[in-house]
Each structure stands twice: as C-alpha cells, then as structure tokens.
Amino acid sequence: MKKLMMTLMAVTFAIAANAQGYNVGSSSRYTDSFGNSTSTHRNANGGITGTSSSYTDSFGNTTTTHRDRNGRVIGTSTTSTDCFGNTTTRHQNANGGYIGSSNSYTDSFGNTHTTYSNGNGGFTGSSNSYTDSFGNTTTTYSNNNGQIIGSSSSHTDSFGNTTTEQRSNNTNTSIWSW
C-alpha cells in the first residue's frame, strides 16, 4: 500500500520523527460535536497532500475516507474493536479492493503495539506507541526486518484538536499509508 504500505499503515496521523530527524510531513485533526473527525495532511514544505474524514457508527466501528489533494477518493479504512480491546483496521483502495490491514492491542502499561500486513497477508512492519503523562503520544515504526524507519509524535490541545509531526530516517520515505 503505497511504499511499505507506503511504508506502514498508521492512519491516525501525527507529526513524526525518526532516528535521523528528517521532517517528512504533518497532519492536523479536528473533531466535531458529533465525534466525526477530519484530518488535513501536509508534506514537509507545508503543502496539502490530502485529507481523511472519519465517522463512527452505533456499533463502534469507524470508517475513514481518504482523499488526495484534489478531493478524489483514493481509499477507505474500517476499524473495529473486539471484546478484548484488540483493534483491527482493514484498508481498501478506491475500487474497493483489499490492500492490507493492521492489528493492535494495548498492554497493561497503556502502550499500543501494532502489526501490519499487505493484501496477501504478508507481514510488512510494526509500530509501538506510548503516551506520556502530558497526553503526548510517540510512535516508532519498524519495517518487516525490525529496522526502525521513522516515528511520529502527536499532541492534542485543550480543544480536542490533534497535531502530528512525522520524521523519517530517509528524506524520501513516507510513513503515511495514503
């Protein structure tokens, strides 16, 4: 899915940083009073690269529609959580074709661990997230060989708006999934 799923599927974006600190993009998310959210994604130069719009149904399943900078739909993601608190997200392209998924669980310390697979079920990478006492979340991404390829850091302000910064160990590598 576009470069390690474009390098890894993590579709709640934030500003990321990697070992070498190349800023490769950011996103800002706004959530309305109905709980629906809209994210605007930008590249390292601040140019808009696309948007994501999410809503959650009465069953607690979240559907996200991804659009490019011209507003064209390029894919969707559907997230569900089981009775054990494990989360599965399935990704589809603009034609509805299955292109991969992610599976997450949260440990007893509140850290989230995620594995990613492509459309054929092959393992493509993983990520690990933790949230500090200030509510800031840091995520580290690794490829299918366990090599760290980047990271992201997210902060939610008092209005509930979330900003994420992304950094990669390669200036040409994106961690975004879309």
Identify the residue ranges that each predicted region occupies.
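Repetitive, compositionally biased segments used for assembly/scaffolding
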Residues: 20-178
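A periodicity- and composition-biased signal for non-globular, repetitive helical segments
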Residues: 8-9, 48
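Sec-dependent signal peptide recognition
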Residues: 2-8
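Hydrophobic h-region of N-terminal signal peptides that target proteins for export
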Residues: 10-18
